[in-house]
Amino acid sequence: MDLSNLKAAEGSVHSDNFRRGRGHGSGNGKTAGKGHKGQKARSGAPRPGFEGGQMPLYRRLPKRGFKNRNTLTIVPINLSALERFDNDAVVSVETLIEAGIVKNPRDGVKILGNGELTKKLTVQANAFSASAKEKIEALGGKAEVI
């Protein structure tokens, strides 16, 4: 060890910010680098969204609508998507979730008549279009509203 590779002991060197406001000799006494008076010299910060007394944006804009948390989201499913089920199968919301057609178990299901159906199925859904119901029943299946 010599004078060219001296190092301070670990933990002994601190940032100057730890010693603010500790007398004139420090160069950061009295106002501790905050300047004189005024909003920025005070403790605490204004709350988010405060615009210095000007009418804030969230009060200048009109209130408009809301999102109803109890609304049932209806997922439309075409008859062509039901082709993957076996003949005489019962197609319910649970089986549609297992097949990956419906993602959220809280969603409702409406069966639409787009595409062709070639299998006899018992389909349980929240709603059916007229053409879908007609096509399901034409093959001897059932369209049950749950």
UniProtKB/Swiss-Prot annotation:
Residues 1-57 are annotated as: Disordered. The keyword DNA repair does not apply. InterPro entries: Ribosomal_uL15, Ribosomal_uL15/eL18, Ribosomal_uL15/eL18_sf, Ribosomal_uL15_bac-type, Ribosomal_uL15_CS. One of its GO terms (cellular component) is cytosolic large ribosomal subunit. One of its GO terms (molecular function) is rRNA binding. Signal peptide: none annotated. The keyword Transmembrane does not apply. It comes from the Bacteria. It holds the Pfam family Ribosomal_L27A. Coiled coil: none annotated. One of its GO terms (biological process) is translation. Keywords: Ribonucleoprotein, Ribosomal protein, RNA-binding, rRNA-binding. Part of the 50S ribosomal subunit. Belongs to the universal ribosomal protein uL15 family. Binds to the 23S rRNA. This is Large ribosomal subunit protein uL15. The gene is rplO.
